[in-house]
């Protein structure tokens, strides 16, 4: 049974897992008609990170406006839609509930099916807007909350072959940025500084030679903090550019080395980089070089910058796959802030 019985295959998608309220209208799973993103970064900057209560309040204020703007920009009426997609996890529980409530209300009001989408699957399927996915593939998922290597044999099949044992890569960037006195979020600033500095400090590359695909960034974070604090105690001024370059060199080398190694062991046609840290130019450049040198037969897919961060377009792309597999939800669908990949295919 298919829900796509109307003239056009159109879905409304809602994303509210963290600090971006986003609503999109997607056609055919790979065409963005609108992708409205209401960012809250300025509200969280003074706290140096996302405050869940503040995030939830912003979602309440923005979600209805975003729905109206998404439909208007797409020139689509509710009657033309075939379903409503919504992120149900992972994320901040309060933030997720706002998006879920809005999506349920809209779906109920217009008698449309509700499609549950795993936020992390959404990041992977953002690559559908670049090119069709070819299986098997490997996805390096790097964000503020996750660092994972995910192997996919087919649509909707996710096998985590490696993950961080402590801090996520994006989390390490933000903590290092705080030490350097950079505004939140710090990833873009550190990336820019790194391109002007050199790897002077040779920070540790954790687990680089271990026979697995797991990551660890807590040791790097500690080494960085100790280097800065020790210099301060000696009254020594360190180069912010060199510190940023040294930190980024460590993160990127570990991510690239482990990813290439995983792609050499698992048969893959494509490598995807997804998540907020996929916007990092240093990582993009290093991965492109490594792929061309070591795995020329593998195609590298990286979403455009505007689709690396949280957005509803990626949720819509993933929702088309869920709909094809008849994965729909009732109005009892609840937020699952800690949901993993392994449960996505079990959604009924």
From Swiss-Prot:
Gene3D superfamilies in the record: 3.30.420.40
Key words, A-Z: Acyltransferase, Cytoplasm, Iron, Metal-binding, Transferase, tRNA processing
Family statement drawn from the similarity comment of this UniProt entry: Belongs to the KAE1 / TsaD family.
Cofactor section: Fe(2+)
Species this protein is from: Enterococcus faecalis (strain ATCC 700802 / V583)
Catalytic activity entry: L-threonylcarbamoyladenylate + adenosine(37) in tRNA = N(6)-L-threonylcarbamoyladenosine(37) in tRNA + AMP + H(+)
Described purpose of this protein according to its UniProt entry: Required for the formation of a threonylcarbamoyl group on adenosine at position 37 (t(6)A37) in tRNAs that read codons beginning with adenine. Is involved in the transfer of the threonylcarbamoyl moiety of threonylcarbamoyl-AMP (TC-AMP) to the N6 group of A37, together with TsaE and TsaB. TsaD likely plays a direct catalytic role in this reaction.
Cellular compartment(s): Cytoplasm
Name of the protein in its database record: tRNA N6-adenosine threonylcarbamoyltransferase
């Amino acid at each position: 049974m298919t829900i796509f019985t109307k003239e056009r295959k159109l879905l409304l998608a809602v994303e509210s897992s963290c600090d971006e309220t986003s609503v999109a209208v997607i056609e055919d799973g790979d065409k963005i008609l609108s992708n409205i993103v209401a960012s809250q970064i300025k509200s969280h900057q003074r706290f140096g990170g996302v405050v869940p209560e503040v995030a939830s309040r912003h979602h309440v204020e923005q979600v209805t406006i975003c729905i109206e703007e998404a439909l208007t920009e797409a020139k689509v009426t509710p009657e033309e839609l075939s379903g409503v997609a919504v992120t149900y996890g992972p994320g901040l529980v309060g933030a997720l509930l706002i998006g879920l409530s809005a999506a349920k209300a809209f779906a109920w009001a217009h008698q449309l099916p509700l499609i549950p989408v795993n936020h992390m699957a959404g990041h992977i399927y953002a690559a559908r807007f670049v090119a069709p996915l070819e299986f098997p593939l490997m996805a390096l998922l790097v964000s503020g909350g996750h660092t994972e290597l995910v192997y996919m044999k087919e649509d909707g099949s996710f096998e985590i072959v490696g993950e961080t044992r402590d801090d996520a890569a994006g989390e390490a960037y933000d903590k290092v940025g705080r030490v350097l006195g950079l505004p939140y979020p710090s990833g873009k600033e550190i990336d820019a500084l790194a391109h002007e500095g050199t790897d002077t400090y040779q920070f540790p590359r954790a687990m680089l030679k271990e026979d697995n695909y797991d990551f660890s960034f807590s040791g790097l974070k500690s080494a960085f903090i100790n280097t800065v604090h020790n210099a301060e105690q000696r009254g020594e001024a360190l180069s912010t550019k060199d510190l940023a370059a040294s930190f980024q060199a460590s993160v990127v080398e570990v991510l690239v080395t482990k990813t290439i190694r995983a792609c050499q062991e698992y048969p893959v046609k494509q490598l995807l980089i997804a998540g907020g840290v996929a916007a990092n130019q240093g990582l993009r450049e290093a991965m492109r070089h490594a792929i061309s040198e070591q795995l020329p037969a593998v195609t590298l897919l990286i979403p455009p910058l505007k689709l690396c961060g949280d957005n509803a377009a990626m949720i819509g792309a993933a929702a088309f796959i869920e709909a094809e597999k008849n994965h729909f939800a009732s109005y009892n669908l609840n937020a699952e802030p800690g949901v993993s990949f392994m449960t996505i295919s079990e959604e009924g």
